[in-house]
From Swiss-Prot:
SUPFAM superfamilies: Terpenoid synthases. The keyword Lipid biosynthesis applies. It comes from Schizosaccharomyces pombe (strain 972 / ATCC 24843) (Fission yeast). PROSITE patterns: POLYPRENYL_SYNTHASE_1, POLYPRENYL_SYNTHASE_2. This is Farnesyl pyrophosphate synthase. Farnesyl pyrophosphate synthase; part of the second module of ergosterol biosynthesis pathway that includes the middle steps of the pathway. Fps1 catalyzes the sequential condensation of isopentenyl pyrophosphate with dimethylallyl pyrophosphate, and then with the resultant geranylpyrophosphate to the ultimate product farnesyl pyrophosphate. The second module is carried out in the vacuole and involves the formation of farnesyl diphosphate, which is also an important intermediate in the biosynthesis of ubiquinone, dolichol, heme and prenylated proteins. Its cofactor is Mg(2+).
């Protein structure tokens, strides 16, 4: 099945799960206008993305089972995949409010839609609650039910911790590079992105396939957290050095005072004179300041540093993958598939 067909099939499953929520609301006599609002919120905030996280649940489950999924198995994996997408949507609704963002996936952010405003705060909670409704409906009788609940709660908490540190370290309206460090960047990336984007989908598939032993989960986490960190460092690099005609966006990390890998590496390597330039220009909303920051990055050979980082990190990831014991039910191809998708990517 092509990537386009996989995406379309996954997308076609969402109305089934939304209908389950809507039908439940009818049984408890929730007014139609509330039900319709909730339904619109669920569709608006979950559709239109790449679905990488949700599809990773299905792909990983199929690899673990070792054969194509029948319809029942597919829907079991798909509902977990959509729970990951709901979690992502919950985070993004709140992120967009906190960041005062204007658009998301090519349309206005939910809080900017007509009549929404601050109601979006409650809508974010409602989107999160849909996860646990679907989890109970589809997995209440499964032996892994409590493990799945705990996994979602743990990863949500981890992501929120990462977001908290990011917000306190790099507020857009208050630049203080003394708060930045590579150690903080690593924590933010691992907690804010890697756990829910890389570890969660695979861990869900492992529970579904019955191979989620403590040893297997630790092995998967060790690999996937490094993969997730590498992915975010790539993102930071592409924001500064990517081709906008390929990435589809013009980078704004320097203007927005982002605690990115690039600025943290620059701070670790720079001379006192270069540090003054970075302090005076980073996070300033003008193109001349941005140019001065980029000039320092060039002097520090950030491009070359990234290439060295990439090769070192990928070598470490491959070593960890080679060490996976497949006799326990875990499969190396889960991780090689992830790595293949992101190695040397340009967007």
């Amino acid at each position: 099945m092509s990537a386009v067909d996989k995406r379309a099939k996954f997308e076609s499953a969402l109305p089934v799960f939304v209908d389950e929520i809507v039908n439940y609301l009818k049984t408890i006599n929730i007014p139609d206008d509330v039900t319709e609002w909730y339904k619109n919120s669920l569709f608006h905030n979950t559709l239109g993305g790449k679905y990488n996280r949700g599809l990773s649940v299905i792909d990983s489950y199929e690899i673990l089972l070792g054969h194509p999924l029948d319809e029942a198995a597919y829907m079991k994996a798909a509902v977990l995949g959509w729970m990951v997408e709901l979690l992502q949507s919950f985070f993004l609704i709140a992120d967009d409010i906190m960041d005062a963002s204007k658009t998301r996936r090519g349309q206005p952010c939910w809080y900017l839609m007509p009549g929404v405003g601050n109601i979006a705060i409650n809508d974010a909670f409602m989107v999160e609650s849909a996860i646990y409704f679907l989890l109970k409906k589809h997995f209440r009788q499964e032996s892994c039910y409590v493990d799945l609940i705990e996994l979602f709660h743990d990863v949500t908490f981890q992501t929120e911790l990462g977001q908290q540190l990011d917000l306190l370290t790099a507020p857009e309206d208050s630049v203080d590079l003394s708060k930045f460090s590579l150690q903080k960047h690593s924590f933010i990336v691992i907690y804010k992105t890697a756990f829910y984007s890389f570890y969660l989908p695979v861990a869900l598939a492992m529970h579904l396939a019955g191979v989620a032993t403590p040893e297997n989960l630790k092995c998967a986490q060790d690999i996937l957290i490094i993969l997730g960190k590498y992915f975010q460092v790539q993102d930071d690099y592409l924001d500064c050095y990517g081709d906008p005609t390929v990435t589809g966006k013009i980078g704004t990390d320097i203007l927005d005072n982002k605690c990115s890998w690039i600025i943290n590496l620059a701070l670790a390597k720079c001379t006192p004179e270069q540090r003054v330039i970075l302090d005076d220009n980073y996070g300033r909303k003008d193109s001349e300041s941005e140019k001065r920051v980029k000039a320092v990055f060039e002097e520090l050979n950030i491009r070359g540093e990234f290439e060295n980082y990439e090769e070192s990190e990928v070598s470490e990831i491959k070593k960890l993958i080679d060490g996976v014991d497949e006799s326990t039910g875990l499969k190396k191809s889960i991780f090689t598939t992830f790595l293949g998708k992101i190695y040397k990517r340009n967007k």
